[in-house]
Amino acid sequence: MAAIDLNSDLGESYGAWRMGDDEAMLAIVSSANIACGFHAGDPAGIYRTVKAAAEKGVVVGAHVSYPDRVGFGRRDLDATSEELIADVIYQIGALKGVAAAAGTTVRYVKPHGALYNRIANDAKQGQAVIDGIKAIDPSLVLMGLANAPILDLARKAGLAVVAEAFADRAYTPEGQLVSRREAGAVLHDAAKIAERMVQLAREGTLEAIDGSIIKIEAQSICVHGDSPGAVAIAQEIRRRFEADGIAIRSFASDR
């Protein structure tokens, strides 16, 4: 039976401000990328989300970011390697403490937003993130954009990696994510998205924004928790996968 991981960005609420529906998403996904306080999330909310993930058997990952709450971590920063290494260590360390208190462990790291996009092709910042992960826990898996150079860089440094595709994002013919600033970059039709993800899981291909077919080898699929209709999209993907005999299972289950 074909199997693939389904992940979502969670724990991003802050105080009275609510982002997404963590409880609903945790009933659907197999892995949860938990905010670590740098782009979103407060201690009580992060703890609550990690506890809920542990109770549901969902694997927990550290969703590390640039220090940018105002910009929700979506603004690019020219951080030095020293700063970035320390930021990564700090965030993973914080989530490890929360996870221990909640009776679970942090199994992987997925950078967020601008940091995720930057390190996909920026070797200097990518190496800093890798060095930060290795400094605190070299057993952690790095999740990154499928087909991006960061995955090879991490492998060469001795880290295990997982390639990720995005359910609700359009792709360029080169296999990169279409910028959110461009029309059609974010997808909203749950049925069409689910059909695309079945194609990805079965054939390892997707239709790019220009209609061409591109190769995407991914072991995990992300549904952004803050996207409009995120829960409905995730539910439809899960329904289609179950109907087509595709198992939803965290990549960490095999490690």
UniProtKB/Swiss-Prot annotation:
Catalytic reaction list: 5-oxo-L-proline + ATP + 2 H2O = L-glutamate + ADP + phosphate + H(+)
Keyword Zinc: no
Sorted UniProt keywords: ATP-binding, Hydrolase, Nucleotide-binding
Broadest EC class assigned to this enzyme: hydrolase
Pfam family for this entry, one: LamB_YcsF
Recorded superkingdom: Bacteria
GO process terms (BP): carbohydrate metabolic process
Keyword Disulfide bond tagged: no
Gene Ontology terms, MF aspect: 5-oxoprolinase (ATP-hydrolyzing) activity; ATP binding
SUPFAM superfamilies for the chain: Glycoside hydrolase/deacetylase
UniProt-listed Enzyme Commission number(s): 3.5.2.9
Stored InterPro entries: Glyco_hydro/deAcase_b/a-brl (IPR011330), LamB/YcsF/PxpA-like (IPR005501)
Signal peptide start and end residues: none
Complex formation: Forms a complex composed of PxpA, PxpB and PxpC.
Function, as annotated: Catalyzes the cleavage of 5-oxoproline to form L-glutamate coupled to the hydrolysis of ATP to ADP and inorganic phosphate.
Family from the record: Belongs to the LamB/PxpA family.
Name recorded for this polypeptide: 5-oxoprolinase subunit A 1
Gene of this entry: pxpA1
